[in-house]
Amino acid sequence: MNNLINIKEVEAKLKFTFTQPQLLVTALTHPSYRNETVTITEDSERLEFLGDAVLCLIVTEHLFLLFPSMDEGTLSTARAALINAVSCCQYTDALGLGEYLLIGKGERIQNERGRTSAYANLFEAILGAVYLDGGLAPARQITVPLLPSKKDILPLMLGNPKNRLQQLTQKQLRTLPVYQSTPWISPQGAPGYHIRVIVNDEIWGEGFALSKKEAEKLAAQEALDANDYKDKNTVDL
């Protein structure tokens, strides 16, 4: 057992007690840490593979039951947004598990892309470990509370907010939105982006994020919300 990991703390955050705690240790072991530590023989990659499938099943079932009249194409769009790397990274952050990741000294996760990838893989690996140890029920109990509310899933079903905003401005105003970027520093001191979306020389929305792509999406969504835009393909809530 790795003495660097406080198993009880992680279990408390998950609200799940492992009968095979070594599974949790393996899930927390990044491949780079195994490569740099001669006493470690297993890393998280196989558990990530399993956890990815478990997450897909849980989210699929959740959406299927939540929206009984929704077609499979729209459900697939929402599912893709709920299981992508950005979402899985957010699940890790929500659970407060990032600090327990065992990662090699040579592995860089300071930048947003590296952090997102590492934390997303961590969530999937932990979910795989929980599934192996306790089955689908505890994996579901961990995952479902992390998912957005029914109301917040609606924008995911309608697609990328940038595309929706462009469709709106083209149809109603015969113009395209313009995105202006300026540097931004997060409260934690990390460099990021402040994006303003401009339509007909007016600021429609703003977004702040560590990645430019995410900041643009947030700005577009704020613009849509401010203009009370509703897609034709609405979902009954």
Curated annotation (Swiss-Prot):
SUPFAM superfamilies: dsRNA-binding domain-like, RNase III domain-like. Mg(2+) binds at E48, N121, E124. Digests double-stranded RNA. Involved in the processing of primary rRNA transcript to yield the immediate precursors to the large and small rRNAs (23S and 16S). Processes some mRNAs, and tRNAs when they are encoded in the rRNA operon. Processes pre-crRNA and tracrRNA of type II CRISPR loci if present in the organism. The lineage of its organism: Bacteria, Pseudomonadati, Chlamydiota, Chlamydiia, Chlamydiales. This is Ribonuclease 3. Homodimer. Its cofactor is Mg(2+). It comes from Chlamydia felis (strain Fe/C-56) (Chlamydophila felis). The keyword tRNA processing applies. The keyword Cytoplasm applies. Residues 7-135 form the RNase III domain. Its main location: cytoplasm. Its EC number is 3.1.26.3. It comes from the Bacteria. InterPro entries: dsRBD_dom (IPR014720), RNase_III (IPR011907), RNase_III_dom (IPR000999), RNase_III_sf (IPR036389). Residues 160-229 form the DRBM domain. The active site is at D52, E124. It catalyses: Endonucleolytic cleavage to 5'-phosphomonoester. One of its GO terms (molecular function) is metal ion binding. Keywords: Cytoplasm, Endonuclease, Hydrolase, Magnesium, Metal-binding, mRNA processing, Nuclease, RNA-binding, rRNA processing, rRNA-binding, tRNA processing. One of its GO terms (biological process) is rRNA processing. It is found in: Cytoplasm. Belongs to the ribonuclease III family. One of its GO terms (cellular component) is cytoplasm.
